């Protein structure tokens, strides 16, 4: 049971890592959408006639900041991906350990049942032998 609870704990930690990856993926998608929206707004701002350079420069700076944020999120997702793999390996190892212990427990149970059956047969043989001897006397 201790090994099963350790395995369950490892599964929970793996699920946490998956949730962290999902959150990072969502944030990365939101940043990508914001980058696209900023580009579209920048294109619309550049129309024939008047050009607002301050607005264009500000939009470019904002887009650069968003790209940096997206890169950071990508690095974080890569790190979380490595952690997911480590936790997945830990879960697999815990599963193997639990299965091995279950097999061992089953073998011990079978061995015990076989020993009990042999004992019962021996007792029955002794009773039959005594009965036969008493009948011969």
Where do the language-model regions lie?
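Charge-rich amphipathic alpha-helical interaction elements
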Residues: 1-137
């Amino acid at each position: 049971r201790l090994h099963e609870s350790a395995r369950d704990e490892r599964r929970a930690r793996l699920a946490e890592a998956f949730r962290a990856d999902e959150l990072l993926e969502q944030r990365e998608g939101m940043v990508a959408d914001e980058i696209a929206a900023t580009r579209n707004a920048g294109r619309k701002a550049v129309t024939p006639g008047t050009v607002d350079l301050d607005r264009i420069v500000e939009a470019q700076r904002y887009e650069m900041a968003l790209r940096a944020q997206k890169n950071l999120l990508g690095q974080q997702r890569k790190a979380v991906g490595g952690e997911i793999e480590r936790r997945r390996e830990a879960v697999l190892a815990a599963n193997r350990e639990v299965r091995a212990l279950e097999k061992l427990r089953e073998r011990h149970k079978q061995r015990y049942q076989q020993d009990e059956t042999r004992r019962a047969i021996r007792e029955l043989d002794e009773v039959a032998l005594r009965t036969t001897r008493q009948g011969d006397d």
